[in-house]
Amino acid sequence: MADIHILVADDSAGQRLDAYLGANDGCPTRSACAHLIEGGAVAVNGETCLSKKCAVRAGDRISVDLPEPHDPTDVIPEAIPLDIRYEDDYLIVLSKQRGLVCHPAHGHESGTLANALVYHCGIDHLGTVQGEDRPGIVHRLDRDTSGLMLAAKDDDTQRALQNLIRTRTLDRRYITLVHGHIAMDEGTINTGIARSTRDRVKMAVSDDPFARQAITTFKVLDRFDSTRFDDGYTLVECHLFTGRTHQIRVHMRHINHACVGDPLYGKCDARADQGLTRQFLHSWRVAFDHPVTGERIECRDELPWDLAAVLDDLAPRSLGRTAAGDDIVPQLGLLEA
């Protein structure tokens, strides 16, 4: 993603957000900006704004996440298997496997989740609020993060689901294993997150006025004893109240407990990383009120084999589950649960 930061001048106050952005150098056309706004790519004073009609005010700090440019191409249907956990006429809940990119970008023009969704649903039966190259995509998971995701079959449903994220009523829970022992059994991390000024591939905790607010709560499920090769581990459930790029990975690094196996924010020590070649991070539970039917939807997803194998190996080193761990760990599909 490319970032654009704009400070609204006095003489621009009162303009519609899409019109204001469309007239700024570095931003695309007004209609393209409207799509970016509706897709959750625009923040005003650190908060995502989904209304293109919102009037800007003098002194507003606006951040725009522009997709990386790539050659325009139709998203070609590809028969990539989808692990669907719930589906109706409006939306899909699926489990994304590790290694699967969500949508086409440079270096990944095919073989993405978007290609699979077009094959499964047809391009005319997917929401395009996020852009023609991101059909159906409501929110993203990093390539090597596995687990539950949502896809929408029309624009109205896509907007409604993104609004659940904006209003923090889409309940998303992740399981991660981190280095070291987190001292407290639960906590909240509330910071700004912005692109790193040292490495543009990374995100970082930031107090920059243009940083976007990121809130993660966590509960410790289990701790595992240390050895001469590592500092021990903590198994954690994280609850996302916002959806910033790399949010959990950045927040865990911020409290000095990086996700095991994380190639960007972790230790990059094969032995300490338990042989993992990707971050130990899995979207295990989503729950929300269906935006059309009102039905309560809740899906859970056991850990994939590579992550489960790590925990099975660590089980003899357990220092004792917490009360939250007694409730959650048996639902993760572990041999030792």
Where are these regions (language model features)?
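Short coil-to-beta-strand transition motifs
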Residues: 75-79, 206-216, 280-281
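Short Pro/Gly-enriched beta-strand edge/turn motifs at strand-loop
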Residues: 64-67, 198-202, 213, 265-271
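RNA pseudouridine synthases
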Residues: 1-188, 192, 197, 300-316, ...
